[in-house]
């Protein structure tokens, strides 16, 4: 299949470029994403029914009638809906200071003056300068959207008024503000652009402050809907968003970009593919583009040299540790209304190295507290805690694969998470008691999933040097190659989106900006069904052939696909469309002659549960498969399988093909005998099966959790940590607990698939 444009990366920038080219110009666009989930930092991940939005915490300037809303409405076909956050969308907490930020900028200014009456003049000037500098930054954005002659004129106009914009935030505050408390309060949102006041340009500070002056908004149903609604317009125009596609090289001929080389991770084996198109857009960052995907020597290296040197001078940005919390109850029960909380131990925002060290010791200096479920309207309820740090603090584990970094790394994450939760508790009393499950990501996690150098998810740091330098922008020195996203625009969701707009404008040439501006004025057109047009490779129409209730909360589901799929491997999963722009992942229990067998739990009561409970035989949907990297290792070692609930599903597929199954062991956990799937499914099983019942005693079963069985039965089962591969699948809490036990017992080969 031929495409007009290839976009590398499916973050908000890449999808904006692809969506505009598809909807406004009818281009067939192929979007390639290395992760198994589209959306970049707008994607969400799920654990046992709960979901967290990894990179979207609030978005400003999307009120009805705003320019930002116009872009989202157009690209989503009007299907993306929004929830407004509380009036006090941000709260700044310091020793002796607790200030709530109103969505009314006039009221916010008055509240600041009431709190700091001696600084009234400085506060008035501050808001005036924020608006003035924001206009200066906007001129920079527009340069990337218009033809070169017009951009040169705008650049000249920008030079006349850039002194304040290119000072540091600290320099500005020290010059105009006397009160240490007010300086700290005004700089509180530096986490939204990733640099403390001494390093950040006042330009980016003003841009972010201005962005939120009218309050915060959040996508109804979660940020994953951004990618899913944008994707439909891309597919309707004949394009595709393909996941598990790692671009390893941008191909050039005679100095011009002509295609990409890809490692395709979807099937049974990783294999190389080449895609060609007249236009290539990279939305994975300038550094990855110029230093990794293109030659750094020869003619291409010479052309990209200035951009690479600029990136080297700018250095690396900031990363973070994020703690994801599932809550037992609605956080409104402890007085939380859905606004964000910025908690600080002192007025000092500086000392990155010192604060990174204290974070590792379990004493964070600051923490950002967010409640995604209250913003999205989803349940179960969730919270997120974020503290900024540098990647080098975790560098000693960088060479180890994800999930195999050992007990010291796990203990470090637990210590950090406890410290962050303690600090959050100081501003949100009662939060700790609500916590039901904890998962922690580090800069290594961000680096793994986004490929950003050092896990710096904001891209090149927004220092004064970045704003004094010639902007990277969407144009490159390589013909037919463009940049999109944050590096072509600015930090954050809206900054990356504007980078995507700029790239689309440049791809379309001199008439690009007028074409897109005209398209935005047309009413958005929804694509009501993901199967209402020809489907891209990897997606299949499916019909529900049968469903059978195996236990009170688990269904066995069989779907007939419209065609056979290519090679797959046991352990992989399928992604099922469950309606309303929502997709859910289910491990493949079996796949033969285009018949897909799944085990689906309805225990969480979410969208997937409602879909399968209400679907009748003959119901139609769309399935994407195969995906995922959970698979049997070809090691020849003994295997120990540990599963709870529908975590048995991928193992059923493994059992059907595993050699020497009689030498293997399965520990299957459930609460009662009526939930024992091993007794209700006709399938090959390992030679030793231990049924672990946590709430009932029964003959021939182990009474206790699977984590207890690992230690209590190790001798009887002759389990040797040094010669055993462990496969672990089930609820996220069980996987976390079992992994901790296995690490303590000395197991080093542990493959996990948390649900």
What annotation goes with each model-predicted range?
Residues 330-441:
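C-terminal segments that line or cap access tunnels to active or ligand-binding sites in enzymes
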Residues 534-619, 670-672, 693-696:
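Ferredoxin-reductase
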Residues 209-257, 261-271:
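Helical element adjacent to the flavin cofactor pocket in flavoenzyme catalytic cores
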Residues 604-755:
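FNR/FR-type flavoprotein reductase catalytic core
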Residues 218, 248-378:
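Mid-domain catalytic core of redox enzymes
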Residues 179-193, 364-368, 426-490:
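A glycine-rich dinucleotide-binding beta-alpha-beta segment and adjacent secondary-structure elements
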Residues 2-135, 461-462:
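N-terminal glycine-rich phosphate/pyrophosphate-binding loop and immediately adjacent elements
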Residues 94-200:
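Rossmann-like flavin
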